[in-house]
Amino acid sequence: MILSKGILVHTHNQSVLLIKGGGLFMSTVQSYFKDFLSNIRLSDNQVKELKTGHTTLRRRLEEDETLSKIIISTFLQGSYRRSTAVKPKNGNKSDVDVIVVTKLDSEEYTPEEALDLFVPFLEKHYKDKYRIQGRSIGISLSYVDLDIVPTSAPSESETEVLQDETIISEYTIEDFQQKFLTKSFNNDLLESAYNIFYKSDNEPQWKAEPLLIPDREAEKWDKTHPLEQIRWTVEKNKNCNTHYINVVKALKWWRKTQYPDMKHPKSYPLEHFIGDCCPNDIKSVAEGVVLTLENIVSQYTNKPFLADRGVPEHDVFARITDEEYSDFYDTVCDAAKIAREAFDCEELYDSVCKWRELFGNEFPPAPKPSKSNSSTGFTTRTEKSAAIPEGRFA
């Protein structure tokens, strides 16, 4: 039965009205995006390995006879904590960042001296597996990469926040998201975490100062604000109807797979840029991808200054040259055109083919339409969508 505003089809033993929105049948396209997102996210085994790696590291730090005396707390940051990580490719491993909040006075210890305090601990537990980097200590295990990021002593008020169980917990933004959608909590700690990370910008607790981390190469202590990065992402995801973190994952995958040899922007700078360009109130991941790419094309012909979350004087794009940005911008122009064509396609099969052109083979293929349904543009799916917990949808 053909209706004036859509097409009534029978699929999965139920009638579904597929309304053309933006030129395509969004309810069906979303099932393809759901499987795509399931394909590119960290696997359960990779998440388990990350947890094994960071919990072992944090326990060893807390139990170390020397370091335990100067450590206030440890907590997770990075794309894993923000739920914007995608699965690694080409033999790379999953990674997680561990912030180590210390009592060290930045006036008494140079960055190099602060990092060197960890060497005996590293020699004991991670001999031949660690490297001292510019602003952190990298640990490469057979199954996961870890980054230790030490900080200098925070203020007294900040110390209390950084020792809060919800901050030092391992809950990710997707964990918070589930509770935001269902308003249900299975323990007091998760409810407390939800309440803290869903606070608004003007809450006093988020007037906290940035932390100082050692920059060995610049020979100075530098500001960072990982908690504000987490809070900002939680808020943005809520404002985007929980689609934001999936827009980030989709575009990270595009960057990783379609332009693997392009040096910049790397993971977090790209994520930050997506955050600045993705509109609020998007109705789907597909819409978020299209509008984000088009906003970059229309608003950022030249390399912008990207003010870091919580440290606005820092430029997230500082390490990117104008030439590198120009190369990246050209790739975005191409991607924006493909994404818009995919979004506006009249036929589902053609739309899916365009999305696969953008995202590669992890975006599931659509069977070619038969003569019986080619006139409607509807392609019946032959495979069931992968199960993704509520909230992880396109």
Each predicted region: which residue ranges?
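N-terminal regions immediately upstream of nucleotidyltransferase
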Residues: 1-96, 101-117, 136-138, 367-373, ...
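Terminal (often C-terminal) interaction modules
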Residues: 2-35, 301-394
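Short, compositionally biased low-complexity segments
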Residues: 25-37, 87-93, 212-227, 303-310
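Long, charge-rich alpha-helical interaction segments
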Residues: 193-245
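Conserved nucleotidyltransferase catalytic core and NTase-mimicking acidic/glycine-rich helix/loop elements
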Residues: 233-344
